[in-house]
């Protein structure tokens, strides 16, 4: 089992809560899937809390406190405010996987826009009323494929 960890030197702009959460995650040897199951969210949403990109509800804070053995007042202080979204990634991104996601939007962004406008009319897809998930598919030849679903209200 591989665990996502945090190298704070690679992410100097993340909030203090990121270090607190990732340190406890590593100590407990928990995956984001396990954390997500415990707090009742999907694993991308759980990871977004760890990176300071999603707001934790009071229920999330209680459940994370219990699961990770972090005192509730510490998490309330660190996660109680509003996230400062978007500050963690420099543009263009240097991390190869993040860059590939950026490249997908760079290469297909206008194509997505054209097709979405044809299907839905003028407008935008919400990133607020939004959900996303990651799944793994294995084809008949044994190759692994990443399936990323983006679901936003129009």
From Swiss-Prot:
InterPro entries: Cyanase, Cyanate_lyase_C, Cyanate_lyase_C_sf, Lambda_DNA-bd_dom_sf. It comes from the Eukaryota. Keywords: Lyase. The active site is at 100, 103, 126. One of its GO terms (biological process) is cyanate metabolic process. It holds the Pfam family Cyanate_lyase. Its EC number is 4.2.1.104. One of its GO terms (molecular function) is cyanate hydratase activity. PANTHER family: CYANATE HYDRATASE (PTHR34186:SF2). Catalyzes the reaction of cyanate with bicarbonate to produce ammonia and carbon dioxide. Belongs to the cyanase family. This is Cyanate hydratase.
């Amino acid at each position: 089992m591989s665990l996502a960890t945090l190298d704070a030197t690679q992410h100097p702009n993340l909030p203090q809560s990121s270090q607190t959460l990732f340190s406890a995650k590593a100590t407990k040897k928990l995956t984001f899937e396990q954390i997500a199951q415990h707090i009742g969210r999907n694993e991308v949403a759980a990871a977004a809390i760890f990176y300071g990109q999603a707001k934790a509800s009071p229920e999330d804070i209680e459940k994370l406190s219990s699961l990770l053995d972090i005192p509730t007042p510490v998490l309330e202080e660190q996660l109680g405010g509003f996230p400062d979204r978007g500050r963690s990634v420099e543009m263009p991104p240097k991390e190869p996987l993040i860059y590939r996601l950026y490249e997908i939007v760079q290469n297909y962004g206008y194509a997505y826009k054209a097709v979405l406008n044809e299907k839905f009319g003028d407008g935008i897809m919400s990133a607020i009323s939004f959900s996303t998930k990651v799944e793994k598919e294995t084809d008949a030849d044994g190759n692994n494929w990443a399936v990323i679903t983006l679901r936003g209200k129009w």
